[in-house]
Amino acid sequence: HSFPKGIIRDYPDYSIRGFMIDCGRKFIPMSYLQDLVKIMAYYKMNTLQVHLNDNGFKQYFDNNWDKTYAAFRLESETYPGLTARDGSYSKKEFIDFQKQAATNFVEIIPEIDIPAHSLAFTHYKPEIGSKEYGMDHLDLFKPETYQFADDLFKEYLKGDDPVFVGKRVHIGTDEYSNAKKEVVEKFRAFTDHYIRLVEGFGKQAVIWGALTHAKGDTPVKSENIIMNAWYNGYADPATMIKDGYQLISIPDAMVYIVPLAGYYQD
């Protein structure tokens, strides 16, 4: 008897094979996230982006920002009371989750989504919300806004054993108003600031594609920056590649699943 012999080569076409889950609009239990990592590993997916904050649309809440649902899911000692009461993750379990995922060759990319999608933060600290563009927008003209967000990111980035364990951190940066040139320039400066903040802690910054929608003169760092290209109207892929960004293509109409939303071909 003889056994056939040979070489099997198994390798991916794409270095990042990812999935994003929105834990902001709806709480996702840690046990579910742990199971999801195991399933991803089985299918040789290697990146899970965990969207830690978001909010609903005010038109579904009597057009009242105060009534509109919003949540931030991670324990915060810097801002006691910020963390959602209807479901959250302790720092310890989030650290353990990231380390366990790494043993399955899955990198967790935590996302704190600012300066839009930020109602959880303005519910906590109303004075940093934008009266002009909506309370789900941080007011980019106030120094207090930067102080708040700086301290929040630093809580999870600093120290020898930081809460954000992996090599990448997502800073959000999508769907902010472009109604006026001055606010566009502020948005671009804000984006650049938080790219450099996370880089200062040795992390690679990941951003949502928004710089076509927010076209302006203020430079935004592109070297070694990953951009989630989700809609061409917000970030034209050809332009973004020319500008030096590394793109991950996630076209919303084809890959987003938003239950009962009605606007993603579901």
List where the protein language model places each region.
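Extracytoplasmic/secreted cell-surface and envelope-processing proteins
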Residues: 29, 57-60, 117-120, 179-181, ...
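Feature activates predominantly on carbohydrate-active enzymes
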Residues: 1-137, 144-146, 150-168
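Active-site beta-loop-alpha junctions enriched in small/polar residues
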Residues: 24, 53-57, 113-117, 174-176, ...
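Short C-terminal domain-edge/linker segments immediately following a structured domain
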Residues: 49-53, 201-202, 256-262
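Alpha-helix initiation/capping motif
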Residues: 12, 22, 60-61, 221-222, ...
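Aromatic-lined glycan-binding groove of carbohydrate-active enzymes
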Residues: 234-266
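Active-site neighborhood of glycoside hydrolase catalytic domains
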Residues: 121-226, 230-245
